């Protein structure tokens, strides 16, 4: 079914590819291995002329617990194929971290957003922090009725996740409240705000997603591609890209501030005790 380490790839319907994050023991937390597996799987679907729609899912029990703070078991960026144009990953201080995080978080997510085929995220259970980035990269989000969306990164002394789409997804005032409080958005509230397209019973999530994918796949491919580009470019023309570049730079400023104060890139007060030592060990590595 899959030759990837952390994701599954299949074609459940004609013209539909499904990419499933598959680290259930880690709650589908995203490490570098998963990032590059996802990229390879997205490329595979994008370059397959028979595929017209791509579905992104997460193995139960939940969609994504966000970034894996435990890292990659000793592996570094050298063990994975660099996709973008960032460089100097080994540089000291902010330079190296900026390059690494730009590659594996912001730029690669933007790359997925701009795949020239419709993409649908099927979200069940929790979708936290880095998991939001994965869902936001998709054109449509279908949520199970138990889906919960949260970005707790402010509690860790950082101004939201690296792919800072919050104002574009839920509106400016709600984005401020959501981040300031680190509250959870339920599926129905997320739908009312426009971040989620549909809410369905959990037991019917994949059936509903595949039915939607099949309906979209019946449309002309070039019309789907150009419509997606037109809508994405409309959003970009309103300043989305510039705003996200600025937010990413501020995110890195927060990391540098925390490194000076605490010796790690986040405020340890926002980390569970069980995570602090692992985070320290990962960052030292």
What is each model feature region?
Residues 1-59:
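Conserved CoA-thioester-binding segment of acyl-CoA-metabolizing enzymes
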Residues 35-37, 70-74, 160:
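Glycine-rich, phosphate-binding/catalytic loops in enzymes
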Residues 58-107:
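Glycine- (often His-adjacent) and acidic-residue-rich active-site loop
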Residues 1-14, 63, 75, 81, ...:
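C-terminal alpha-helix plus adjacent terminal tail
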Residues 33-37, 104, 111, 208, ...:
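Charged catalytic carboxylate motif
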């Amino acid at each position: 079914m899959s030759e990837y380490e952390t994701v599954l790839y299949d074609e459940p319907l004609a013209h539909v590819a499904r990419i499933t994050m598959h680290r259930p023991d880690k709650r589908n937390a995203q490490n570098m291995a998963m990032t590059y597996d996802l990229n390879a799987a997205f490329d595979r679907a994008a370059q397959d002329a028979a595929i017209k729609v791509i579905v992104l899912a997460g193995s139960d029990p939940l969609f994504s617990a966000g970034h894996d703070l435990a890292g990659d078991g000793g592996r570094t960026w050298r063990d994975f194929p660099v996709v973008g144009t960032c460089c100097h990953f080994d540089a000291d201080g902010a330079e190296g971290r900026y390059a690494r995080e730009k590659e594996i978080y912001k730029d690669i997510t933007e790359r997925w957003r701009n795949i020239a085929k419709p993409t649908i995220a099927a979200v069940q259970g929790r979708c936290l922090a880095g998991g939001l980035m994965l869902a936001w990269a998709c054109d449509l989000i279908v949520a199970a009725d138990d889906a919960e969306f949260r970005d707790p990164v402010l509690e860790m002394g950082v101004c939201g996740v690296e792919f800072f789409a919050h104002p574009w997804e839920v509106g400016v005032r709600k984005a401020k409240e959501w981040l300031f409080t680190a509250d959870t958005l339920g599926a129905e509230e997320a739908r009312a705000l426009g971040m989620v397209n549909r809410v369905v019973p959990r037991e019917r999530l994949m059936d509903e997603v595949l039915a939607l994918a099949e309906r979209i796949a019946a449309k002309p491919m070039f019309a789907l591609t150009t419509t997606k580009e037109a809508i994405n470019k409309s959003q970009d023309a309103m300043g989305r890209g510039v705003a996200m570049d600025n937010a990413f730079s501020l995110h890195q400023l927060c990391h540098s501030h925390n490194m000076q104060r605490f010796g790690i890139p986040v405020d340890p007060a926002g980390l569970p005790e069980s995570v602090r030592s692992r985070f320290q060990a990962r960052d030292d590595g």
